[in-house]
């Protein structure tokens, strides 16, 4: 991670850390770096999408100004999901795509995330190149004039093109399925209900009334309990909860129980494997995936690989070997045959197709994967790097691992986007999880916690 770019683009409190001035400079630097390979005289084409945050308009305007000042043609997509921007960037042969969103973070935050012409997130080297320009003492980038300046146009029909692609990834409609949706008052608000209705599902929706301030507020994939209640109330066959920018999915079964990313990966992986469509019978997951996921995958004759936390690392591993399925427990799921990044709506239609074509309830499909009790605690710290390397912290982790003797695991890591240290434990019982997590968390709090 660099000075500006975290694990998922540039993020911060809008108009305080992520200012209009920084967005303008990112437009210039990003536009230049991503278009310098173009033949001389060819104008770069950049797509811009955003979620429903009130600060999106301000940052979009500033970002566009920066791109225009470098001579780029800008196509505004309006409110659309992150994977929608990634797909359209590739399918429209654009030079780059940019999404303005802070995903599942609170409304005060926002972020700017770039995609290359192939629809994939930028690699570390490209991000570093952009950072070097931002840090330069002087802006020496080209400043075209007259006819060489950039221009902007609206391409709101891009969303329809994206939905069309999603519909073509399934072979049958969802007639007879009652699907409840939670759009987190975010980027999928104008899209998800239309997608599932077009596929003949009976659709009920919550979290579908964005007002610029309510994104992720008590709704969406980070608050699935709201949708769980709604599924029970409506008697739906399943529920699908997206996050603010639509790149995650957490599902709810017909009983109102949560089906997380691990279970969705297992269900989809097993189905694809049986159909002969899972490359090397392999699923790419992260170190956060539950031990139960690994046991179920193995039992079904598949292999699970592990990467660092972050969908970008999952995608890197998938690209290297052309694996078809990967994801995270948090609900980022990547179907590389159809998409270049995590896609909540794509994951939703794949899961609904499995429920429809197998004729089995989602609860039955999910029950095949056992879940080891897991506890995760986030601790706000003064310096996450110091906390991760603290002598007492490391000693306490070693102590806990020795106690476990292989029957469970501990994972302590720094958040890629916030000043947090995450302490996670899995063990045979919930009581043991609590004990291990609290033991480590207490030391982190005492030595590095914001509140001491």
Swiss-Prot record:
PANTHER family for this protein: PHOSPHOGLUCOMUTASE (ALPHA-D-GLUCOSE-1,6-BISPHOSPHATE-DEPENDENT), PHOSPHOHEXOSE MUTASE
EC number from the UniProt entry: 5.4.2.10
Functional note: Catalyzes the conversion of glucosamine-6-phosphate to glucosamine-1-phosphate.
Entry annotated with the keyword Transmembrane helix: no
Gene3D superfamilies: Alpha-D-Glucose-1,6-Bisphosphate, subunit A, domain 3, Alpha-D-phosphohexomutase, C-terminal domain
Name of this protein: Phosphoglucosamine mutase
Pfam families (UniProt xref): PGM_PMM_I (PF02878), PGM_PMM_II (PF02879), PGM_PMM_III (PF02880), PGM_PMM_IV (PF00408)
GO CC entries: cytosol
The record's account of how the chain is modified after translation: Activated by phosphorylation.
